[in-house]
Amino acid sequence: MNAGDEVIVPSYTFVSSALAFVRQGAKIVYADSESDNPNIDTSTIEKLITKKTKVIVPVHYAGVSCDMDAIMGIACRYNLLVVEDAAQGIDSYFTSPKTGLKTSLGGIAHMAAFSFHETKNIQCGEGGLLIINDERLVRRSEIIWEKGTNRAEFYRGEVNKYGWVDLGSSFLPSEYTAAFLYSQLCELEKIQLSLIHI
């Protein structure tokens, strides 16, 4: 992602969907929502694509899946990355009308992000989860996650010492946070059922 690159985001979303890209100097291009829900209207995406477009960010609003067949098809035609904003998509699925295949949200695009904000079904106050579904993105993601170091490669025995190789930050959860999240995952079905009745 370079300054001036463009990212297509639905017009109805929280600021976090665009913020990571804006911090890298990207220009946000807003796509219309569907007429019957706030998800991205896939029929509006192609006319927004330019030579500077790099990423499409479908937001699965309230855990309702976007048309990922259409979005991934467009991304393939134009050689674009897709980053699913699955912040509200824990335990939600996309069923392909083409194949009938049911896939977890976050498991379709090149990358996906889930939120553990206190307003989500599974929460720990703040934080989230990054899913990497494209091998080309794993190394850089690990470096950013490990404070800019190649420590993950060191732990796997791929290098004999680790060092700073890029920019990064500290994204590691505490053991308490992980335990709190794990206990909710163990009770996910019960949590989801209780929310249906609210």
Regions found by a protein language model. Give the residues of each.
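Hydrophobic beta-strand core residues of beta-sandwich domains
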Residues: 1, 105-106
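A subset of signal/propeptide-processing and intrinsically disordered low-complexity segments
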Residues: 1, 79-80, 170, 190
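PLP-dependent aminotransferase-like
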Residues: 2-93
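A generic hydrophobic-helix recognition signal that picks specific residues
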Residues: 53, 77-79, 103, 127, ...
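Active-site region of PLP-dependent enzymes
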Residues: 88-97, 101, 108-194
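Conserved small/polar residues in nucleotide/adenosyl-binding loops
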Residues: 196-198
